[in-house]
Amino acid sequence: MREKIKLVSSAGTGHFYTTKKNKRNTPEKIEIKKYDPVVRKHVAYKEAKIK
């Protein structure tokens, strides 16, 4: 089943992206480099739960 997740910026800006992930195929937490418009750089985004 695909679940909604939140990707939170590691730069500490509070910026986040939302996406879906298949928990069966990727049970570990995702870490992706994406663009953070607050600091205007590509930074690591880590998976967090949507509350």
From Swiss-Prot:
Keywords: Ribonucleoprotein, Ribosomal protein. Belongs to the bacterial ribosomal protein bL33 family. PANTHER family: 54S RIBOSOMAL PROTEIN L39, MITOCHONDRIAL, LARGE RIBOSOMAL SUBUNIT PROTEIN BL33M. InterPro entries: Ribosomal_bL33, Ribosomal_bL33_CS, Ribosomal_bL33_sf, Ribosomal_zn-bd. It holds the Pfam family Ribosomal_L33. This is Large ribosomal subunit protein bL33. It comes from the Bacteria. HAMAP family: Ribosomal_bL33. GO terms for molecular function: structural constituent of ribosome. One of its GO terms (biological process) is translation. It comes from Marinobacter nauticus (strain ATCC 700491 / DSM 11845 / VT8). GO terms for cellular component: cytosolic large ribosomal subunit. The keyword Ribosomal protein applies. The keyword Cell membrane does not apply.
